[in-house]
Design a protein with these regions (language model features):
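Soluble acyl-CoA-dependent acyltransferase catalytic core bearing the H(X)4D motif
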Residues: 2-33, 41, 48-331
């Protein structure tokens, strides 16, 4: 169960600020750009990171505002919007929003009585399905108060282009302290200065960035080709096998699945439904061990089992469902 008032900017003892360096890149990576632009062509593929926390009671609103404001100093990406280069010639560039307003991104609502956790989940669903305003930093948070048992719900929605799941965990860690009382002399940083970057300016930055990266990319390519050639001479069959392996992996990524997948999910709309199922970690680990798998295996199996029951309820039968699995590339 959560602390009664966990939103206290932590001290240096609580968290290592160097652990949240994921917002340092000025330009989106190719993967992040794909996530950013994909939903324009296929809105059904929107997949924001949504974290829902159940709190013992509602935190002090002013302290929550201060905590999120502090986090925006420590992680400047929180204050940044994505600027598309002219005609999308290149990847979007992160730029400090000159009109950044913490009150726009962080809001609160009190549910009318009577209100239980299911009512709060409905509010979370609405937040999760609202498209981001791409002229602003792509994240939002909502404090939901008024539950009958005195609890509160805090939900945070972040676009995948900002960070991955691990980065989201680091972000939530920043907002939580190990003590209920305010922390004096907490580490802080000066917030980044506002920027007025246009699409033409973003394109210019992309061009300059590509020119600067060109020598290192060419050198890396030459070194890689030399290493491959040397390996091929000493072990030609091993090298050929590795090349074929990479080619097959690439083919699997870029080629659509041969199976049609789920007829129910294929024509899904933009709506979402939120529900919860509480399973203890010890029980999940025991089930995984009994089946000869890992904890992650058990989690994925439970999800697929839920999809199986969902299809059965609608009289549909599917043998397999294509799915994507995010993999952390952090070291």
């Amino acid at each position: 169960m959560a602390n009664s008032n966990p939103f206290v900017p932590p001290s240096a003892v609580d968290v290592d600020l160097s652990a949240v360096a994921w917002g340092a890149s000025r330009t989106m990576s190719d993967f992040e750009t794909g996530m950013w632009r994909m939903e324009e062509a296929q809105p059904q593929l929107r997949s924001p990171i949504v974290a829902v926390e159940v709190l013992d009671r509602a935190p002090d609103w002013d302290r929550l505002l201060d905590a999120v404001e502090w986090a925006s100093h420590v992680v400047p990406r929180i204050r940044m919007r994505a600027v598309e280069p002219a005609m999308q010639l290149g990847n979007p560039v992160w730029s400090v929003d000159p009109e950044f307003d913490i009150g726009y991104h962080l809001r609160r609502v009190r549910l009318p009585a009577p209100a239980d956790f299911d009512h709060a989940l409905r509010m979370c669903r609405h937040l999760a399905t609202e498209p981001f305003d791409k002229a602003r930093p792509p994240w939002s948070a909502l404090l939901i108060e008024g539950l009958d048992d005195g609890r509160a719900v805090f939900v945070v929605k972040t676009h995948h282009s900002i960070t991955d799941g691990m980065g989201g965990i680091q972000m939530m860690t920043l907002l939580h302290s190990r003590r209920p009382d305010p922390t004096p002399n907490k580490p802080d940083r000066t917030p980044p200065a506002p920027e007025h970057l246009s699409s033409v300016g973003a394109f210019g930055e992309e061009v300059v960035s590509e020119i600067r990266r060109a020598p290192s990319r060419i050198a890396k390519l030459v070194r890689g080709a030399t290493n491959v050639a040397a390996t091929a001479i000493s072990s030609p069959f091993s090298t050929a096998s590795e090349v074929l392996g990479y080619a097959n992996s690439l083919r699997k990524i870029v080629t659509p699945p041969a199976r049609s997948g789920s007829p129910l999910l294929h024509d899904r709309g933009l709506g979402r439904w939120f529900g919860t199922l509480e399973v203890g970690v010890p029980e999940l680990k025991a089930g995984a061990k009994a089946a000869g798998g890992s904890l992650n295996d058990a989690y994925v199996a439970a999800l697929l089992g839920g999809f199986h029951r969902y299809h059965e309820a609608f009289g549909q039968s599917v043998e397999s469902i294509p799915m994507g699995m995010p993999i952390s590339m952090r070291t």
